[in-house]
Amino acid sequence: MSTSIFQFLAEPLSSDVRIQIQRWSNADDVRRLAVMPDVHPAGLFCVGMVIGTQELIYPIAVGGDIGCGIAACRFTSEGSEITQRHLLAIFEAISRFIPIGRHRRADHPALPADLAQRPLSDPVLEKFKFHDGELQLGTLGTGNHFLELQIDQDQRLWAMVHTGSRGIGQAIFQFHFRHCVPAQFRRSALVADAPEGVAYLADMQWARDYAAANRRSIMQVLS
């Protein structure tokens, strides 16, 4: 069965991206493939590429930064009210209360009750959840994650944060990737309705909810 390919592009594709598109369009159970304007290679998959399947799950296509996204909040202050002195104080507070890596054990926020009470699929992941998961809640991370202040066209002041599920998302990805079965072109997959696939989907949803809670925690500090 041929794969339907949809492209939303701002510039021509690189040869490396074209190779990935060709390979993934021929992978088992890939029915649809979409290419976004920011597409670029990232190992065995491309950031900015989306695949649609019916029976198989490819954890490598999701990656470890499960639930990565953006949140924004508007302040009551206007941009014109913020002086250089205010900015220095704001960024000093951000660097103090919103770590890049993890909180100190003594002052980290607790996991929301829903996340704490909802078990992950393996004791190894549960242990990680209550250690790194707690210590990294409300932290930014590295790479392309960011926290910035913005002023819109009406001079209103905003904060925007881009971050995801931190180390627990990576742990979930690595744990389940070991249970994948070989598929075409060195890709590894989980059968969606098999126990391993069901467990992965549940853990992935947990990580998505954690990522949203992580962004909310950061926004609460800013507010």
Predicted features along the sequence, with ranges:
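Short acidic, Gly/Ser-rich segments with clustered Asp/Glu that frequently serve as metal-coordination loops
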Residues: 41-42, 69, 164-169
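Glycine-rich, flexible loop motifs
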Residues: 1-33, 47, 53-61, 66-154, ...
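Short polar/acidic secondary-structure junctions
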Residues: 39-41, 54
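Conserved beta-strand/loop block within the catalytic cores
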Residues: 39, 46-48
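Histidine-centered acyl-transfer/condensation active-site motif
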Residues: 157-161
